[in-house]
Amino acid sequence: MKMNVYQEISQIIKEADGILIGASNGLSIAEGYNIFADDAWFQENMGDFREKYGLRCILHGFSVPMKVEEKWAFVSRLVKAKAMQDEPSEIMKNIYALVKDKEYFVVTSNAEDHFVPAGFEADRVFEMEGKLTQMRCKNRCHDEVYPNQKAVLAMTEEEVNGRVPKELLPKCPKCGGDMEVNWGAMSSFTETKNWKEKAARYQEFIQNLHGKKLVILEFGIGWRNQMIKAPLMQLAAVEPQARYITFNKGEIYIPEEIKEKSIGVDGNLTVALKEIRKGRID
């Protein structure tokens, strides 16, 4: 009996020597987190900042100048709500279930840090634009990042009228200056030692899978994306046994040169992942 597209993908993953996952904003949106939207969540949780500064989305909030005690109030609310979830989403659980028994690596521009809590090994996840759950010295006096969850909880508990008490503001352990969240949306974002180590592991993974059955799973990446999508498409083109599978609601882009080794899945990601996990023949 002929397989449907979900069964075909399930079989391709089963036969893979390694899985390379690429993920961007479309995956976040499928989980209910949209940094570009003036949606109900943003209006309810950031309404005071929205009114005071004319903000229209999360990303806008990172670009508008604020006093440090206000900026950390904005950031700590966001981190607690979107990057410190009690339970991984069904989507993330299903993605992990597909690859957990394989050699895998994740490259993502998403900063909400949802991969590791879902079971992915931290050393196999390269967050190209940093993580909301990390902070670093704003003065860049040294090249280290630090977890910020403990500080975030303290700040959200004591925030008053959109400001964090000055005594709770994170300070650099080296120079005593202000800390800031380690995310690419910050104009001062730079590549850290940790970033460079992850980048090296990414290239090592690709080299180790050269000539083997590499499956590229791409989640929520727009066709213009040069950071992740373009390199993944190029990799699919040069690797003879590679398969390229892209999931993106409302927009599927597959170049002609890799069309024969590719599959595009439009529509509801939650449904697609459930069906692929089943791997059943109807």
Regions found by a protein language model. Give the residues of each.
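Conserved catalytic alpha/beta core of Sir2/sirtuin-type deacylases, generalized to analogous enzyme cores
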Residues: 1-282
